Design a protein with these regions (language model features):
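A short, hydrophobic C-terminal helix/tail in secreted or cell-surface proteins
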Residues: 176-180
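Glycoside hydrolase catalytic-domain context in secreted enzymes
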Residues: 1-175
Length: 180
């Protein structure tokens, strides 16, 4: 049986830090002495982008706001399965998606990457999408969780949201897996 505690204890502090940063935008660092491989990631809200070394083409699915508007969990799971298959074909370990932020502001320039303004719908769709991707032994990495409503100064902006709104609206979709 694999002993994660033993492995963590064998890692040096520098090795632990290196696992938190990454080799580049698409690969994690590897630790050869402990047989820890690099993990390959890929982005794309509606397709498996791959990396610049891949010459394989990508399928382009409708953007998440379009598939979210179907309210069809079975269809969205099939999209997830297809994305998982394509990711596997490109040797991708982790698909960076889905994006689960809610549409909270009409000027949100990346809302097309999100499923909906409705937290319950977003949560249920995200669960189906993730189950589809992960059925192909590819990890799905949820991103843009809460209060990511603007592209203006996106790396430094402060999204100030009161606790009541966070609990009543912004966090609701994060509990969708509890109500299968």
């Amino acid at each position: 049986m694999f002993d994660i505690e033993k492995l963590i204890n064998e890692l040096t502090l520098d090795e632990k830090i290196s696992l938190l940063t990454g080799f580049n935008s698409w690969y994690s660092n590897k630790i050869p002495r402990l047989n820890i491989p690099s993990i390959k990631m890929s982005d794309g809200p509606n397709g498996v982008r791959g990396d610049s070394t891949s010459n394989k083409s990508s399928a382009c699915f409708p953007c998440p706001i379009s598939i979210g508007s179907t309210w069809n969990k079975k269809l969205i799971k099939k999209v997830g399965i297809a994305l998982g298959e394509e990711a596997r074909d490109k040797d991708v370990d982790v698909l960076l998606g889905p994006t689960i932020n809610l549409h909270r502001h009409p000027l949100g320039g990346r809302h097309f990457e999100n499923f909906s303004e409705d937290p319950v719908l977003t949560g249920k769709i995200a669960v189906s999408y993730v189950k589809g991707v992960q059925s192909k032994q590819v990890s799905a990495c949820l991103k843009h969780f809460v209060a990511n409503d603007t592209e203006f100064e996106r790396h430094t902006v402060s999204s100030n949201v009161d606790e009541r709104t966070l609990r009543a609206v912004s966090y609701t979709h994060l509990r969708a897996h509890e109500t299968r």
